[in-house]
């Protein structure tokens, strides 16, 4: 009875019961669907589409559609969806997040809602974290969709414009979050409708949703062009800052991730630079460079935050340990790090278009996600994205043992204990996966294991290419694998090893070549006797190894440091105990670890000191684990507050972006061009009358001469009017007279050029000016945001001030757009029609050659003499790179 009451009170348990009723319906249909021939089964797609056309809902056909996908998967892939996978599919269709543990088959789960929603013909996007997974899943799961008559597209780095357009027209499109976001930005820089690649954003399923929507939430996608600033000052400050003394000339706050120069430090820098006052208005650029150089030297650590590879500074993802190619820190920080490391400095950039993942994914009509760890961030998913989290039960009971944390006084003592633990388990043959938080720590541990003669594999950002292969074999007998954080997500660790990987490797050694596509799909190209014999041999070997590994307790996970997010720790633990396998996990910590040092080691340190505990003597108690988790919760809450605060500022910019992009799209497709221009002319006339003949001022004091000069310059060139012609008119009469004259001039211009040419001129001019003004507005808003925090000292709410001033700046930008459009419309000289073929070729090229505080994902910078990324066919310096009279 008590259990019943507990379940009744448990929201998640109630959800599972609701889902089970739908699963029962699907299971009842299984015999009927299984009896169908291939032709009849494949014909169900047309039947479903016909029923939808007649008004039936997706929910109405869900049980049958899911039963069809389950049977198609069984026939094509040899994989039948478990009941819990059906539950996950229902949750995804409902636009929620399904939390499913590692190894529960999330990739297969997605086929159910993807097929169902693709039947509408509006497109479904499946979003993965990297190109490898996008390729693998589109090839692997694509077999099911193609069997059922759906088309499958793939969006990865390096595709040209036509390939992208074709992929987006498919029923199902796989790709990475970066590519989807950049394509959205590029579509909003297009100059012709046929340059658009994306359709309306309908339905997206985000794999590893926590990684993309939370870890990367504040990361802006940026398309940028080169600015004209010199890089000399970065080298200057890279020489100055190392001569400053920590805690004397500057103070570092690791918890807040800030560094502040002291008055002593300011005096030293002024002397070295030979300036009288560093904070004089003329020296603003110097203070900016000093601040970035201090951050680069005091906060950013090589082999933790970034690596230097092939003469480039490459950011390391703090959550996955992967190298983030193409991503750069903004605001000059990346250049400061390049100067610190003595590599070539890339020029600073100017933002052409930008959006955050938070704002991009909120534009989808329906959004869903799946991950192994979402429950800890349930509040954030709900508040920011409106997404509920449903925890799906495992197919088999979870029998993994999570051992209490052990904590040491020093980091050295901790790593000595980790090595002893690895050695003991390795001696028995039990496979061990060790998680570290940085490349530096993984290589230090690797060195200690080498000294002990323990064979092992290292998987970190430096060895990214081998990732899937190393992770797949981490469950072999006696295997020791060191992995930076969560590298290798998306690849299952099979106890005993993966026979297909082993067979392919052996084939390579024998000189055979495996086809890339077949390899991605998990089926090698070599289907001859040699491959089959090898596969059979390795299957027997891995089955025997699996039996022995299970007897030894399965894969053992060792965490060498607690991450500030419990979710990341849970992801590491989740690498073992898949599908009911045995496994165990334990975290080793020290009082010198970042989390313990910054967030709550005082109590534990006090206990250890009072007890006189030696540095090699650990404390192991459930209370310690709870204390660490309490520290993690404090950090998580702080990070959530930061993300929520940032989003409040982003929302201001997002509303402006949506309005500009919506109006830009109407111009692009040629909607109401003439009406828009005539309305702009009327607005410009009204604004001019308000300026030169303001209300409440006596007519004798009106500046009619200035009004006519303004009209000549803007909306009535060559008018031949004098102030006497306007004398005696009221404000309303002035406005009506000037509007009528300017519209007559517009009509004459249209008659001279022809209506079709006039529409094309209007479209191109409006697009160019909107893009140019929007680019400047982005920079201005960025600068406003940088300094707005200081308003708090004047007892003003910075967010309210930002909204108010941002709105004023936006209105000024709109007025400036209207003025420039009207001015250019009356003055443009037509030499020859714009050749769309040329601009289309430029668009294809820009797709083929793809570029905070938070690191920004950038496309490669646009050089001054490169084709402009807007697709105009002009050089960047002659187009979006500067204001241009068309």
From Swiss-Prot:
In terms of InterPro entries, this protein maps to: Helicase_ATP-bd, P-loop_NTPase, SEC_C_motif, SecA, SecA_CS, SecA_DEAD, SecA_motor_DEAD, SecA_preprotein_X-link_dom
Q: Give the compositionally biased regions (Basic and acidic residues).
A: 841-864
Concerning Pfam families, the annotation shows: P-loop_SecA (PF21090), SEC-C (PF02810), SecA_DEAD (PF07517), SecA_PP_bind (PF01043), SecA_SW (PF07516)
**GO terms of biological process kind:** intracellular protein transmembrane transport; protein import; protein targeting; protein transport by the Sec complex
Q: Where is this region: Disordered?
A: 841-866
Q: Where is this protein localized, as stated in its record?
A: Cell membrane; Cytoplasm
Chief subcellular location equals membrane
Residues recorded as binding ATP, renumbered to this chain, are 85, 103-107, 492
Q: Identify its membrane topology class.
A: Peripheral membrane protein
List the CDD domains. Answer: DEXDc_SecA (cd17928), SF2_C_secA (cd18803)
* Keyword entries, A-Z: ATP-binding, Cell membrane, Cytoplasm, Membrane, Metal-binding, Nucleotide-binding, Protein transport, Translocase, Translocation, Transport, Zinc
Tree of life domain: Bacteria
Q: Which parts pass through the membrane?
A: none
Q: Which SUPFAM superfamilies match?
A: Helical scaffold and wing domains of SecA, P-loop containing nucleoside triphosphate hydrolases, Pre-protein crosslinking domain of SecA
| Any one of the GO CC terms | plasma membrane
- Sequence similarity: Belongs to the SecA family.
Report the protein name in the record.
Protein translocase subunit SecA
Taxonomic lineage of the native organism: Bacteria, Bacillati, Bacillota, Clostridia, Eubacteriales
């Amino acid at each position: 009875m008590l259990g019943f009451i507990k379940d009744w009170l448990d929201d998640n348990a109630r959800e599972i019961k609701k889902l089970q009723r739908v699963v029962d319906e699907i299971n009842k249909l299984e015999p009927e669907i299984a009896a169908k021939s291939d032709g009849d089964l494949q014909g169900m797609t047309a039947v479903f589409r016909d029923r939808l056309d007649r008004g039936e809902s997706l929910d109405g056909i869900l049980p049958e559609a899911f039963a069809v996908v389950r049977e198609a998967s069984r026939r094509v892939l040899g994989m039948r969806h478990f009941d819990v996978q059906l539950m996950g599919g229902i949750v995804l269709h409902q636009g929620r997040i399904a939390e499913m543990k590692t190894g529960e088959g999330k990739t297969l789960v997605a086929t159910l809602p993807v097929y169902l929603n693709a039947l509408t013909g509006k497109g479904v996007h499946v979003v993965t974290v990297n190109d490898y997974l996008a390729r693998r899943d589109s090839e692997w799961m694509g077999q099911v969709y193609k069997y059922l008559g759906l088309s499958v597209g793939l969006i990865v780095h390096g595709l040209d414009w036509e390939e992208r357009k074709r992929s987006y027209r498919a029923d199902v499109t796989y790709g990475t979050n970066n590519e989807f976001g950049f394509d959205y930005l590029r579509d909003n820089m297009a100059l012709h409708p046929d340059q658009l690649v994306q359709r309306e954003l309908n339905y997206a399923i985000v794999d590893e949703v926590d990684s993309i929507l939370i870890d990367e939430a504040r990361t802006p996608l940026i398309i940028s062009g080169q600015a004209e600033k010199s890089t000399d000052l970065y080298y200057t400050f890279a020489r100055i800052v190392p001569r400053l003394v920590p805690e004397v000339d500057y103070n570092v706050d690791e918890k807040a991730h800030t560094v502040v120069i002291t008055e002593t430090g300011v005096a030293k820098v002024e002397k070295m630079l030979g300036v009288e006052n560093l904070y004089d208005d003329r020296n603003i650029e110097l203070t900016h460079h000093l601040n970035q150089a201090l951050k680069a030297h005091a906060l950013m650590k090589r082999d933790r935050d970034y690596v230097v590879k092939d003469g480039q500074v490459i950011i390391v993802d703090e959550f996955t340990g992967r190298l983030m190619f193409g991503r750069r820190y903004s605001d000059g920080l990346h250049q400061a790090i390049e100067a610190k490391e003595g590599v070539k400095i890339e020029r600073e950039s100017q933002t052409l278009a930008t959006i955050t993942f938070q704002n991009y994914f909120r534009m989808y009509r329906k959004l869903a996600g799946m991950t192994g760890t979402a429950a800890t961030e349930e509040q954030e998913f709900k508040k920011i994205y409106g997404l509920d989290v449903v925890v799906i039960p495992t197919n088999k009971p979870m029998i993994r043992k999570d051992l209490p944390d052990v904590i040491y006084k020093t980091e050295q003592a901790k790593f000595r204990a980790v090595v002893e633990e690895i050695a003991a388990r390795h001696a028995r043959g039990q496979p061990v996966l060790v998680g570290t938080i940085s490349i530096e720590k993984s290589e230090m541990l690797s060195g200690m294991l080498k000294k002990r003669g323990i064979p092992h594999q290292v998987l970190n950002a430096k060895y990214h290419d081998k990732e899937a292969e190393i992770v797949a074999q981490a469950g072999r007998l006696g295997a020791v694998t060191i992995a930076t954080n969560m590298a290798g997500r998306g690849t299952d660790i099979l106890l005993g090893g993966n026979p297909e990987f082993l067979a392919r490797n052996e084939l390579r050694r024998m000189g055979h070549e495996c086809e890339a596509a077949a390899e991605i799909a998990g089926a090698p190209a070599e289907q001859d006797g040699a491959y089959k014999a090898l596969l059979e041999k390795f299957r027997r070997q891995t089955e025997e190894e699996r039996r022995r590994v299970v007897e030894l307790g399965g894969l053992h996970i060792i965490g060498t440091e607690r991450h500030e997010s419990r979710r990341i720790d849970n992801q590491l633990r989740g690498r073992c105990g898949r599908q009911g396998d045995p496994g165990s996990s334990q975290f080793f910590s020290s009082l010198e670890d970042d989390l313990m040092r910054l967030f709550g080691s005082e109590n534990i340190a006090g206990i250890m000191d009072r007890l006189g505990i030696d540095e090699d003597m650990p404390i192991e108690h459930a209370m310690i684990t709870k204390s660490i988790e309490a520290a993690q919760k404090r950090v998580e809450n702080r990070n959530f507050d930061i993300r929520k605060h940032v989003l409040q500022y982003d929302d201001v910019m997002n509303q402006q972006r949506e309005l500009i992009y919506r109006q830009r799209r109407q111009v692009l497709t040629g909607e109401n061009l003439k009406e828009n221009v005539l309305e702009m002319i009327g607005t410009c006339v009204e604004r001019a009358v308000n300026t030169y003949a303001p209300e409440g001022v006596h007519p004798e004091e009106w500046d009619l001469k200035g009004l006519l000069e303004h009209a000549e310059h803007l909306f009535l060139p060559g008018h031949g009017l004098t102030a006497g012609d306007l004398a005696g008119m009221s404000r309303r009469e002035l406005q009506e007279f000037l509007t009528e004259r300017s519209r007559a001039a517009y009509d004459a211009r249209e008659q001279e050029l022809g209506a079709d040419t006039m529409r094309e001129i209007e479209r191109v001019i409006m697009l160019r000016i909107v893009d140019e003004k929007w680019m400047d507005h982005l920079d201005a808003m960025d600068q406003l945001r940088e300094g707005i925090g200081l308003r708090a000292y004047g007892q003003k709410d910075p967010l309210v001030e930002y909204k108010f001033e941002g709105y004023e700046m936006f209105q000024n930008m709109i007025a400036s757009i209207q003025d420039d459009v009207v001015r250019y419309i009356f003055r443009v000289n037509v030499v020859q029609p714009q050749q769309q073929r040329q601009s289309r070729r430029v668009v294809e090229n820009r797709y083929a050659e793809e570029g905070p505080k938070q690191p920004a994902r950038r496309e490669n910078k646009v050089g001054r003499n490169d084709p402009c990324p807007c697709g105009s066919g002009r050089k960047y310096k002659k187009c979006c790179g500067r204001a241009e009279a068309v």
